[in-house]
From Swiss-Prot:
Gene3D superfamilies per UniProt: Sodium:dicarboxylate symporter
UniProt GO BP: serine transport; threonine transport
Known function: Involved in the import of serine and threonine into the cell, with the concomitant import of sodium (symport system).
Protein name: Serine/threonine transporter SstT
Gene: sstT
Length: 414
């Protein structure tokens, strides 16, 4: 009987809301650090194990997901989504650029167990580009062992294109391997509440409760930047497309898509909601049936903001100098990283080390930044998903309405 009860409890924990569990871990970590400093320092091992598991799985995750995605790409499907695709990419880059501006206007710092002396900063854009090029030609095994994400991406893309010519059995094997790695990531993420409990406890015990204010500032910068993109940048892009007041459409998408996505924290889970909203807006079915799932995959403005803000927070903490060309390059890299963050639990956080590589930040420190992301993830991930998913339907609606108006004007002229 006791075994059945224990099994039932474990099942409820495994199937329970990860957001609520992380919130509980966060609160318990704060309480333990407040009650007993020695005990809080002792449970820091849980956080260390969690970060170690993330470090172990992240390089393999990037390799398998990108390789499987390219190898299993379907050819021959004709769609009229070029304007939407352009808006997706432009919106993601604009979000990354806004995050760079926000991060320099309101610089955030983190509590990391390293100093600037541990870092050899790049002297400028030329050295950054040279480092990127050298990383691209790294041995694949060496890239995996040293978490060289640029090299991993190059090999994943190359192998993915090569495997397009392979037989279906090989493609299925690659896809199954990708699913297996994704399962391992989900398994690691399920331990996030325990890891966050250990990280928060040990961090507060060693640095004091003032750390929370540092995270509060980081959250304000992150969420403030997302609000800026949702309420200013995206409306500007929509106005450029439809040439009229964009806010009725913007607020409709935030209300009927963003709110759902905020609580589900999954762009994929929000696809049916976006489809229903597109139907309600009388959009072209052939267009939105393709653009909405595509948007859930590559339209990642929120992820671009998260990657940029947290990377620059690490840069500011370590005192690494950043010139304007390097900051612009970070916007491009963050946009590309964001497009690869879909379908992965905590995907945007796990791609932060790739952006950190640009500034010579070691993987150990980059994973501490990822851990900070998980600590604030209760709000960060919800806001990020709400921005991502609502933007999918917003840009789809803007492109469809612009095309309808163009056809109507052409009909009137003829």
């Amino acid at each position: 009987m006791a075994t059945q009860r224990a099994s039932g409890l474990l099942q409820r924990l495994a199937q329970g809301s990860l957001v609520k569990q992380i919130l509980v871990g966060l609160v318990l970590g704060i309480l333990l650090a407040w009650i007993s400093k020695p005990a809080a320092e002792a449970v820091g091992l849980l956080g260390t194990l969690f970060v170690g598991a993330l470090k172990a799985v992240a390089p393999v995750l990037v390799l398998m997901l990108v390789m499987a995605s390219i190898a299993n790409h379907q050819h021959g499907q004709k769609t009229n989504i070029r304007p939407i695709l352009f808006l997706y990419l432009l919106g993601t880059f604009s979000a990354a650029l806004a995050a760079v501006v926000f991060s320099f206007a309101f610089p955030s710092t983190l509590h990391l167990s390293s100093s600037a002396q541990d870092i050899v900063p790049p002297s400028g854009i030329v050295e950054v580009l040279r480092g990127l090029l050298m990383s691209m030609v790294s041995n694949p095994i060496d890239a995996l062992l040293n978490a060289n994400y640029i090299g991993i991406l190059v090999w994943a893309v190359g192998l993915g294109f090569a495997l397009r010519h392979g037989n279906e059995t090989t493609k299925n094997l690659v896809n199954d391997m990708s699913n297996a790695v994704t399962f391992m990531v989900k398994l690691v993420i399920r331990f996030a509440p325990v890891g966050i409990f250990g990280l928060v406890s040990s961090t507060l015990a060693t640095t004091g409760f003032s750390t929370l204010w540092g995270y509060a500032h980081l959250l304000v910068v992150l969420i403030g930047c997302m609000l800026l993109v949702a309420l200013m940048v995206n409306p500007l892009l929509v106005f450029w497309k439809i040439r009229r007041n964009p806010y009725p459409l913007v607020f409709a998408c935030l209300r009927e898509s963003g709110v759902y996505a905020f609580f589900t924290r999954s762009s994929a889970a929000n696809i049916p909601v976006n489809m229903a909203l597109c139907e309600k807006l009388n959009l072209d079915r052939d267009t939105y049936s393709v653009s909405i799932p595509l948007g859930a995959t590559i339209n990642m403005a929120g992820a671009a903001i998260t990657i940029t803000v947290l990377t620059l927070a690490a840069v500011h903490t370590l005192g690494v100098p950043v010139d304007l060309p390097t900051a612009l390059l970070l916007s491009v890299v963050a946009s590309l990283c964001a497009c690869g963050a879909s379908g992965v639990a905590g995907g945007s956080l796990l791609l932060i080390p790739l952006a950190c590589n640009m500034f010579g930040i070691p993987n150990d420190i980059a994973m501490q930044v990822v851990a900070v992301g998980f600590i604030i993830g209760v709000l960060q991930d919800s806001c990020e998903t709400a921005l991502n998913s609502s933007t999918d339907v917003l840009f789809t609606a803007a492109a469809c309405q612009a095309e309808d108006e163009r056809l109507a004007n052409n009909a009137l002229r003829s």
